[in-house]
Amino acid sequence: LMLPADVAKKAATPPVSALTVNPAPADSACLQAFREAAEKRLSTSKRTALLADFLVLRHGLRTALQTWVKEVPMAHATMLMGKGIFDERQSGFYGTYSGSASAAPVKEAIEGADTVLCIGTRFTDTLTAGFTHQLTPDQTIEVQPHASRVGDVWFTGIPMREAIETLTALCKTYVRDTRAPLDHSGFSFPTIEGALTQESFWRTLQTFIRPGDIILADQGTSAFGAIDLRLPADVNFIVQPLWGSIGYTLAAAFGAQTACPNRRVIVLTGDGAAQLTIQELGSMLRDKQRPIILVLNNEGYTVERAIHGPEQRYNDIALWNWTQIPQALSLAPQAECWRVSEAEALAEVLDKVAHHERLSLIEVMLPKADIPPLLSALTKALEARNNA
């Protein structure tokens, strides 16, 4: 894209309100046909569940989904990129759906339903453990940004918001959740001691998260471990397994903190991923940003070791002295750094940075071959598919 050099100097009228794009109104005939088809399906459904994904967030409809499950109690879950849509500590929320790699209660709640309302979903390989999801077209009602589907029939020209409003109204009439609600009120973990593992790290981190946080989890053990976190209300969870570009979170965190300087930004990244975009740490220090960065140090590309070549040198990386990196990237770094290898030490450091005033970098020492349960299930599914 080439522009004349003087374009940037031309006078411009600033907008008086936020720049928004209002979708075209729904095609009334298509909307009515969709309503009738959905009503026919829901009126005979004994068990209905809701599965939401990231396109709900992209189109600003999180509040609409939250209102929906509040007004119509039913089993609901998200896919990994949709984490944060719901208050995950409320009854009715089952967890993160990942095909055959899903926890048993989540898998049964979604795949065992007569009708699954799929809102803004994308069933990609890494989100479904290699396309192992068991959801048939006849079982699902799907809502996408500009079209919706009931069974095998697509209805075009229907904005997502209007499709959601239509389904919410129908659910109030036809959906009756007879399952005992899940009780997350006592969701907590006891004090954990000993050397850090994937399990003890995520359990310790769980107690640190609070409403309003912005959490960015890099592709790899960070994202696959974070799937089991129970997020409170109003947490923005940013992850990108759709493209799987490691190193994404440091740059994205710089943007998130720039956009929301008064919110707490938490970065979860691996040592291998962080090495690819570490220069953005310098940008954060230059702008006096104060994210909380947890570098999961497992001596290389652990996610790649799990998939292929656990002992191959191409999955090794240069070992850095992470707690000294801010000194190299700023002449006057406003940063605090720690290296922790014990669960108790991590808990103490997290307590210190809970109300921090400067950038915090925590190097978390983890076993080289330790992987989260979801990653283990995913690699087994991929291996089975490759060997078929």
Placement of each model-derived feature along the sequence:
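A glycine-rich helix N-cap at a beta->alpha junction
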Residues: 285-304
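Glycine-rich ThDP/TPP pyrophosphate-binding loop and its adjacent helix/strand module
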Residues: 23-39, 44, 323, 332-360, ...
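Active-site diphosphate/adenylate-binding microenvironment
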Residues: 181-262
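Conserved thiamine diphosphate
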Residues: 149, 173-190, 307-349
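Terminal amphipathic helices with adjacent charged low-complexity linkers/tails
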Residues: 2-30, 139-178
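Glycine-rich phosphate/diphosphate-binding loops that line cofactor/substrate pockets in enzymes
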Residues: 34-48, 68, 110-113, 204-211, ...
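Glycine-rich, anion-gripping cofactor-binding loops and their flanking helix/strand elements
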Residues: 52-143, 229-263, 275-279, 309-311, ...
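Glycine/aspartate-rich loop-and-adjacent alpha/beta segment that forms the canonical ThDP
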Residues: 4-31, 127, 351-388
